[in-house]
């Protein structure tokens, strides 16, 4: 009996040991097979020319953006976010490089990757790719697209739909004159409706087209009223398809990803389907607060003039905002009527983009991506709506510099939170790198530049009382139509919690108390009681700029007493304007080999003297 019990106990012990050993082996095997990368994904959404006219930012009381509001409810709204230069090309170069214009030299529309500093520094997406992220994008992200910055890229930037007469883009046929004389981009707005039977003034039939500058793709309005996809809708389709495919891939087989989505609207032409216009009856549109004579104590007009070689009616005059405002008002019976029609088209365009944002959120929120994907929504700069007689971007006032910025970061950002600390686009790169714990140098070599921005991750965690290493004032530069830029001879704005300071290139200044004067109506720069504040801000600005300027992409030699020569790029661009067919690969830009080949192919044969 005793032996039997002992044998049973021995057997039980052996079995238990075997089970424990197998459990250990199985656990080890499970750990070995679990190769899921725990790093966060990023979906970065940027809209073009979007000011603060979205819900939660107090820009316009009638805006309808439920999906952007839904995103804000799950993250942090930055109510004092600003751009670093208020026009598309250089603003996006600053955003995606994390480098200020005064350190890169990129204040204008020369291709970003021709600047010595920028081409030797890693873009945001390249930095993610170097950290073994899958990078994919579509639409307008950088102003000059370089596919090599992405592993997978969808659609090029396309500003359509455009009315088209078989040869040239035309303004929307319902856009009144003289505003429509500005052209098919900035001088065009109206609903996307059937053009059957519509013609140009000289009788050419009109149709809708997309395809960017590379091709002509007919866009049809069907009898049902439905339209073929607009460029923004195509980008929404692409993003949804890619997200669905990523969500369907087992996590252990999927790299973390960085996805960029660039929507064109509300950039002009403000042409979107009729149903979005119907949301905003034109007679009911609320107008912004506009002070009569508000421009009288400002000095932007003292530096505006025509760029060299530009005609008074050029689309790219320095005073584009004043020109657009005057032409719009001349096209209607009153200023208020003019602004109502334009704002209706602007709000409709925003609503159309919001619909695409909703489609993207629906995919993320209905899959496992929801808990591990950071979402950022922002704009490259704002847009003035007639304040200070200005209808455009590229001013140093609030309407142009302020942008929406919403960040959802699961496990990091507080939901339904608001942060009023001044931050800017240059801070997004270091913030995402911080949140995703990226490693390595953002400079490719010593000719690059380190990040100028600062991570605001701590403000995501504590939006109300958090601290960060960033400056107290946002620095914004002004774009001008010129080939070379000296950082010490440009125009700048500093925007803090309580003050905006503007110094123009000619030394003129503006100072606004943004607490008591949020509309920036009263310039206090010349009032003695504010001399201490303006002196402080002068010193702050001086401390933020480099000691010496940046060498431009193509430095030009100038003989003493001789006019400054035009750059080679100027002549190449002029040749391209006159000979668009020289662009052999149809990528929207003209390379030097393409120019030489075109000139050779079209050279007149030499006449024999024999």
Q: Which residues make up each language-model segment?
A:
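Acidic Ca2+-chelating loop motifs
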Residues: 585-595
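Primarily EF-hand calcium-binding motifs
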Residues: 572-585
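Signature of WW domains and closely related Tyr/Trp-rich beta-sheet microdomains
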Residues: 511-512, 581-582, 590
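Adenine-nucleotide cofactor-binding loop residues
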Residues: 515, 519, 585
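Formylglycine-dependent sulfatase
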Residues: 2, 17-504, 508-509, 518-539, ...
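Short, composition-biased linear "edge" segments at structural boundaries
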Residues: 600-601
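A contiguous, mid-protein "functional segment" used to position or interact
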Residues: 531-557, 561-562
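Bacterial N-terminal signal peptides that target proteins for export
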Residues: 1-14
């Amino acid at each position: 009996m005793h032996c039997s019990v002992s044998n049973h106990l021995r057997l039980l012990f052996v079995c238990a040991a075997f089970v424990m050993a197998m459990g250990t082996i199985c656990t080890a095997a499970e750990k070995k097979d679990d190769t899921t990368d725990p790093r966060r994904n990023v979906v970065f959404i940027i809209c073009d020319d979007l000011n603060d006219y979205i819900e939660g930012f107090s820009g316009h009381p009638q805006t309808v953006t439920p999906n952007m509001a839904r995103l804000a409810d799950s993250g942090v709204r930055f109510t004092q976010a600003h751009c670093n230069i208020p026009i598309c090309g250089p603003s996006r170069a600053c955003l995606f490089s994390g480098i200020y214009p005064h350190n890169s030299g990129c204040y204008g529309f020369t291709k970003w990757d021709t600047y010595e500093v920028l081409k030797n520094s890693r873009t945001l997406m390249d930095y993610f790719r170097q950290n073994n992220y899958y990078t994919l994008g579509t639409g307008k992200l950088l102003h000059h697209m370089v596919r090599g910055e992405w592993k997978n890229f969808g659609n090029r930037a396309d500003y359509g739909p455009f009315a088209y007469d078989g040869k040239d883009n035309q303004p929307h046929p319902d856009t009144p004159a003289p505003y429509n004389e500005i052209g098919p981009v900035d001088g065009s707005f109206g609903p996307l409706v059937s053009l059957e039977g519509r013609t140009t003034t000289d009788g050419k039939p009109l149709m809708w087209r997309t395809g960017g500058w590379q091709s002509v793709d007919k866009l049809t309005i069907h009898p049902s009223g439905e339209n073929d996809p607009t460029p923004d809708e195509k980008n929404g389709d692409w993003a949804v398809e890619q997200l669905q495919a990523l969500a369907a891939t087992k996590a252990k087989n999927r790299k973390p990803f960085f996805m960029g989505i660039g929507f064109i609207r509300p950039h002009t032409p403000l042409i979107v389907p009729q149903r979005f216009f119907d949301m905003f009856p034109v007679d009911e549109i609320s107008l912004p607060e506009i002070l009569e004579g508000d421009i009288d104590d400002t000095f932007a007009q003292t530096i505006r003039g025509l760029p060299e070689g530009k005609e008074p009616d050029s689309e790219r005059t320095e005073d584009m905002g004043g020109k657009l405002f005057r032409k719009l008002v001349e096209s209607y019976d009153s200023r208020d009527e003019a602004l109502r029609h334009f704002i209706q088209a602007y709000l409709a365009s925003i609503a159309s983009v919001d619909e695409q944002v909703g489609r993207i959120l629906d995919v993320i929120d209905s899959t496992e991506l929801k808990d591990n994907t950071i979402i950022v929504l922002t704009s490259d700069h704002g847009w003035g709506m007639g304040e200070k007689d200005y209808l455009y971007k590229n001013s140093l006032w609030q309407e142009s510099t302020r942008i929406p910025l919403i960040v959802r970061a699961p496990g990091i950002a507080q939901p339904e939170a608001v942060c009023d600390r001044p931050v800017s686009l240059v801070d997004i790169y270091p913030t995402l790198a911080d949140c995703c714990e990226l490693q390595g140098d953002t400079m490719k070599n010593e000719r690059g530049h380190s990040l100028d921005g600062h991570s605001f991750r701590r403000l995501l965690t504590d939006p109300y009382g958090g601290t960060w290493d960033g400056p107290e004032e946002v620095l914004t530069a002004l774009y001008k139509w010129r080939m070379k830029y000296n950082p010490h001879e440009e125009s700048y704005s500093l925007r803090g919690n309580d003050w905006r300071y503007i110094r123009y290139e000619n030394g003129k200044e503006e100072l606004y108390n943004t607490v008591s004067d949020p509309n920036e109506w009263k310039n206090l720069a010349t009032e003695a009681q504010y001399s201490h504040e303006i002196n402080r801000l002068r010193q702050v600005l001086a401390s933020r700029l480099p000691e010496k300027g940046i060498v431009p992409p193509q430095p030009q030699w100038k003989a003493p007493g001789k006019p400054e020569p035009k750059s080679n790029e100027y002549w190449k661009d002029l040749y391209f304007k006159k000979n668009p067919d020289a662009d052999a690969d149809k990528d929207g830009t003209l390379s030097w080999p393409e120019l030489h080949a075109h000139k050779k192919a079209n050279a007149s044969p030499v006449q024999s003297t024999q």
